[in-house]
From Swiss-Prot:
Protein name: Potassium voltage-gated channel subfamily KQT member 4
Gene Ontology MF term list: potassium channel activity; voltage-gated potassium channel activity
Binding site residues for a 1,2-diacyl-sn-glycero-3-phospho-(1D-myo-inositol-4,5-bisphosphate) 1: 93, 172, 219-220, 225
Gene name of the encoded protein: Kcnq4
InterPro entries linked to this entry: Ion_trans_dom, K_chnl_volt-dep_KCNQ, K_chnl_volt-dep_KCNQ_C
Length: 695
């Protein structure tokens, strides 16, 4: 018998020329089976049975050796981008331990500033210059490397990629400050090392350009943005306070100048008076200029009491503005924490919605699970290796019933070897160790054998693994072991294997093939189960996301509590109003409401129309109509009884037809009025008299 190629994990299509599907990590690969064994290009199928894109990689390792170089380059590119992004975050957006580096840089800058200050003192000038020169070397190296790394790491942002993007990043204000400080430091070091006294004295002032290094500590400009936002938010109040304070300063300086210009030489000009007014109204008070006359003192005291209050207003406005802005930022951070739970909740809700079996047109979620589910390729190779080792190096198709020597038959129990075309060989003792791939493989190959051989095998009886090695001809004195928990779990109805391998010698090879393994686990059983498991996982994730989102909705402060209470109060008022409208629609409005509506803009016709719409108004209308009908029936019955008592047709015309009360029939109008009834009665009496005369 020729050795057939090993079969892969089939999804159980019909035999013949039908398409064949192969399962790889719960992702089917379907190919057309040709006449010579099939060599067409495979098509991957997802959990929904729809073909996946042809360029999508197969899950699991070993998907192809041709793309190994591309995968290595892609992995290297990913590592490069990850490193670039990490460095950019450390330098531009420090968090956690990254602050250690920035604190070290701050200490270097602060030390350089202190040494620059000490270098201007005559007693410490020589020592400070030597230490400052060494520190400047260190600062040049550190800041030069940092500047280059900053420009390189900016490529992780899309707008800073390429040479143009790097140049755009270098034009940022803080990068320009870094470049200016770096150039100034290099110039100072170069002049100091050459010993040029003139150049050193000229460039000594450039050291104070290094004060700009303190500005670079706030790379993101958060403090300047906060100050600008506070000034912009309270710009009207600040402009008003500054305007009134400026007017007070001008008038106070001018009046004091007029009062003191003749008696006091300190106020010889209006500029001297403005200097005195600025120092006095800002509560600094150097004391270099003071008014000497009583008129000047009185004016200075009055304008000081009035002007100081306006000059102090901007400080209070800015202080309260900063406090409100900081509180608002804290609230904003608290609200920003809700974004991720809200996004997770929306994503979980959509995935739960899309995994419903009634919505087969939503396939994106299933493609996602096709890509993350594990592969069975390593498991299949392991099973094949174990089978070869157990079969003595033979392939599964070459395994037959092994001959047992006569002497060994009495010492050892008979070993059952099974054969199944196109599949691996498993003995009953090994059935408990079969994986899902082998079970599906046995099911698919059992379907390919055709219905001619399947109907010959009787339905198998499941046996416990503990008693599988005991043959049918064994001694009856041996008691069979009871089912354990693992055996019951192993032989459930959904995952139960039904072997039909007999320990006795089979009559022929064909009978052994007919008694091959049967497996109830097919792809049709696996896929719905997998989808159900995925949907259950989506339900759990949705509930967890919902709980986390509710936890973030807790109030932040008293203002949030008041807002929640006010929103709840408005909601309650709306519900009460809706309930009152429904009650009015059912019961109707009371007499007090009617009087109120009659006094309003609505006319009586609108009021009656509203009352008739209500359920109670309709019930009252029906009752009035029933009463009117009853009254009319009573009148008709009385009229009919009087006609019967008269006895003759001649006296029918003399009977007076009773008239209906219009008040009773106000809500119900009969199609025949009382005048028509009297006329019809007279016509009836005339016709009867004519008929009697003719007789």
């Amino acid at each position: 018998m020729a050795e057939a190629p090993p079969r892969r994990l089939g999804l159980g299509p019909p035999p013949g020329d039908a398409p064949r599907a192969e399962l790889v990590a719960l992702t089917a690969v379907q190919s057309e089976q040709g006449e010579a064994g099939g060599g067409g290009s495979p098509r991957r199928l997802g959990l929904l049975g729809s073909p996946l894109p042809p360029g999508a990689p197969l899950p699991g390792p070993g998907s192809g050796s041709g793309s190994a170089c591309g995968q290595r380059s892609s992995a290297a590119h990913k590592r490069y981008r990850r490193l670039q992004n990490w460095v950019y975050n450390v330098l531009e957006r420090p968090r956690g331990w990254a602050f250690v580096y920035h604190v070290f840089i701050f200490l270097l800058v602060f030390s350089c500033l202190v040494l620059s200050v000490l270098s201007t003192i005559q007693e410490h000038q020589e020592l400070a210059n030597e230490c400052l020169l060494i520190l400047e070397f260190v600062m040049i190296v550190v800041f030069g490397l940092e500047y280059i790394i900053r420009v390189w790491s900016a490529g992780c942002c899309c707008r800073y990629r390429g040479w143009q993007g790097r140049f755009r990043f270098a034009r940022k204000p803080f990068c320009v400050i870094d470049f200016i400080v770096f150039v100034a430091s290099v110039a100072v070091i170069a002049a100091g090392t050459q010993g040029n006294i003139f150049a050193t004295s000229a460039l000594r002032s450039m050291r104070f350009l290094q004060i700009l290094r303190m500005v670079r500590m706030d790379r993101r400009g958060g403090t300047w943005k906060l100050l600008g936002s506070v000034v912009y938010a309270h710009s009207k109040e600040l402009i008003t306070a500054w305007y009134i304070g400026f007017l007070v300063l001008i008038f106070a300086s001018f009046l004091v100048y007029l009062a003191e210009k003749d008696a006091n030489s300190d106020f010889s000009s209006y500029a001297d008076s403005l200097w005195w007014g600025t120092i006095t109204l800002t509560t600094i008070g150097y004391g270099d200029k003071t008014p000497h006359t009583w008129l000047g003192r009185v004016l200075a005291a009055g304008f000081a009491l009035l002007g100081i209050s306006f000059f102090a207003l901007p400080a209070g406005i800015l202080g309260s503005g900063f406090a409100l802005k900081v509180q608002e930022q804290h609230r904003q951070k608290h609200f920003e924490k809700r974004r991720m739970p809200a996004a997770n909740l929306i994503q979980a809700a959509w995935r739960l919605y899309s995994t419903d079996t009634s919505r087969a047109y939503l396939t994106a979620t299933w493609y996602y699970y096709d890509s993350i589910l594990p592969s069975f390729r390593e498991l299949a190779l392991l099973f094949e290796h174990i089978q070869r080792a157990r079969n003595g190096g033979l392939r599964p198709l070459e395994v037959r019933r092994a001959p047992v020597p006569d002497g060994a038959a009495s010492r050892y129990p008979p070993v059952a070897t099974c054969h199944r075309p196109g599949s691996a060989s498993f003995c009953p003792g090994e059935s408990s160790r079969m994986g899902i791939k082998d079970r599906i493989r046995m099911s698919s190959s059992q379907k390919r054998t055709g219905p001619s051989k399947q109907h010959l095998a009787p339905p198998p009886i499941p046996t416990s693994p503990s008693s599988e090695q005991v043959g049918e001809a064994s001694s009856p004195s041996k008691v069979q072991k009871s089912w354990s928990f693992n055996d019951r779990t192993r032989f459930r109805a959904s995952l139960r294997l039904k072997p039909r391998c007999s320990t006795e010698e089979g009559p022929s090879e064909e009978v052994a093939e007919e008694k091959s393994y049967q497996c109830e686990l097919t792809v049709d059983d696996v896929m719905p189960t997998v989808k159900t498991v995925i949907r259950s996982v989506r339900i759990l994730k949705f509930l967890v996301a919902k709980r986390k989102f509710k936890e973030t909705l807790r109030p932040y402060d008293v203002k949030d509590v008041i807002e929640q209470y006010s929103a709840g109060h408005l909601d309650m008022l709306g519900r009460i109003k809706s309930l009152q409208a429904r009650v009015d629609q059912i019961v109707g409005r009371g007499p007090g409401d009617r009087k109120t509506r009659e006094k309003g803009d609505k006319g009586p016709s609108d009021t009656e129309a509203v009352d008739e719409i209500s359920m109670m108004g309709r019930v009252v209308k029906v009752e009035k109509q029933v009463q009117s009908i009853e009254h009319k029936l009573d009148l008709l019955l009385g009229f009919y009884s009087r006609c019967l008592r008269s006895g003759t047709s001649a006296s029918l015309g003399t009977v007076q037809v009773p008239l209906f009360d219009p008040d009773i029939t106000s809500d119900y109008h009969s199609p025949v009025d009382h005048e028509d009834i009297s006329v019809s009665a007279q016509t009836l009496s005339i016709s009867r008299s004519v008929s009697t005369n003719m007789d």
